[in-house]
Amino acid sequence: MVRDSGACVSVALDAMGADLGPEVAIKGADLVLSGAVPCKHKVHLSIYGKESAVLPVLGKYKLVEKNSVFIDTPDAVLCDDRPSFALRHRRKSSMWCAIEDVKKGVVASAVSAGNTGALMAISRYLLGTLQGIDRPAIATVLPSRKGSFVALDLGANAECAPGLLFQFAIMGRAFARAVLGVEHPKVGLLNIGAEDTKGTYNIQEAFALMRDAKQDINFYGYVEAKEAFDGVADVVVADGFSGNIMLKTCEAVAGLTLHILKKEICSSLMGRAAMRILRSCYFKRTSGSALDVRSYNGAVLLGLNGIVVKSHGSADATAFAHAIKEAVCVISQGDMAKEMISEVSNG
C-alpha cells in the first residue's frame, strides 16, 4: 500500500519475534524513520505485540511512537512452536495479527523475526499462494563480485520436486527484474558440480525442465556455491535444505573474515592507524554495508498473495531495519505478482 500523499508505505512489525526482544524491532524502526538506514518512501508502522513488553520500549523511541500505531496482542509465537501448533493455538499472536492485517489490506506488508516454520504456515493459511504457484520460497538478495544476485529457496522447503524448483526459477526471475533491475536475468541451478551426472534425481530433472522450458528463462545451467558469489547468474535456485546451508555458511565466512582482518590489523600500531583511516573514509562513505551481513537481512516469502518479510531471529536493530527496508522495496514493485502468474502459466 503506497499512498499517494507523500508515497507513504504501511508496514506491520511483529515486535515479539526477535531473540533479543521487542527493542530490536522498535529500534530498527527508529533507524529507518531517522534515515540512518534510508528508504525511498516514507514509512508508517503498525506494531504488534504484548502491551506489557512493547509499550515501555516504545516510549523510549519518540520518532517511532509518532509514526506508528500499536496493536496489543495477548499472545506470541514461540521459537519452538511447531507450525501445526501455531496454526491451531497462536491465532491471537503478534505474528498472526500482523499477517492477518496484510490480508485485510490494513497494511501493505509484514516483517517478522519469529519462528520460520510458523511464519510460513500462518502466511500460507491466511494469504494463500499466487495462482499456479504450489509453495512459497524464501528469497533474498546476496552480494557477488559483479554486484548482487537473488537466491531461493533459503529454507522454506527442505525437499523440492523438479516442478517446484522450476517454479522457483520463474519466481526468482520476476524478483530479480523487480529488485535488481536486470531485464533478462540469468538463472542457475545450485548443484555439487557442473557435470550432467552430478546431483540428485530431482536436481537433474529440474535441470531438464529449465533447459527445455517453452519460454526462454535464460538458463545458465548448474552453479556451484563458490560460483554463485562470482556472479555467474542473476538468480540461483536451490532446494531449501541446500540453500539454507549456503546462506548460513556465507554469513559465517563473512563474519570470520571480518574478525580475522580486525584481529590482524589491530595487532600493530601501524595497523591500528590504518583502521582509523578506513573508518574515517571508507566506512563513513559506504556505511560498511558491503562488508556487513546485516545489510542483507530480510528475506521475502515469495509466491504469496501478500508481502511477508522474514528477518533473522538473531538480528540486531540494524539488521531488522534492513528487513523493513526490504519490505518497502518489494511493496514498490506492484507488478511482480502478475508477472509471476503469467510466466508460471506459460511455463
UniProtKB/Swiss-Prot annotation:
Return the protein name. Phosphate acyltransferase
Q: Which GO terms describe its biological process?
A: fatty acid biosynthetic process; phospholipid biosynthetic process
Transmembrane intervals:
none
Outline what the protein does: Catalyzes the reversible formation of acyl-phosphate (acyl-PO(4)) from acyl-[acyl-carrier-protein] (acyl-ACP). This enzyme utilizes acyl-ACP as fatty acyl donor, but not acyl-CoA.
Entry's Gene Ontology molecular function annotations: phosphate:acyl-[acyl carrier protein] acyltransferase activity
The record's GO CC annotations read:
cytoplasm
Spell out the reaction equation it catalyses: a fatty acyl-[ACP] + phosphate = an acyl phosphate + holo-[ACP]
Q: What is its EC number?
A: 2.3.1.274
The answer, when asked if Lipid biosynthesis is one of the entry's keywords, is yes
Assign the protein's first listed, main location to one coarse class.
cytoplasm
Kindly tell me the pathway this chain contributes to: Lipid metabolism; phospholipid metabolism
The record's NCBIfam families line, in alphabetical order, gives: plsX
| Keyword Lipid metabolism attributed | yes
Subunit structure, per the record? Homodimer. Probably interacts with PlsY.
Gene3D superfamilies (alphabetical): Isopropylmalate Dehydrogenase
Q: Which residues form a coiled coil?
A: none
Its gene name is: plsX
What family does the Swiss-Prot or TrEMBL record give for this protein?
Answer: Belongs to the PlsX family.
Query: In which compartments does the protein localize?
Result: Cytoplasm
The scientific name of the source species is Anaplasma marginale (strain Florida)
List, alphabetically, the Pfam families matched. FA_synthesis
Query: Could you tell me the keywords of this UniProt record?
Result: Cytoplasm, Lipid biosynthesis, Lipid metabolism, Phospholipid biosynthesis, Phospholipid metabolism, Transferase
UniProt cross-references to InterPro entries, sorted A to Z:
FA_synthesis (IPR003664), Phospholipid_synth_PlsX-like (IPR012281)
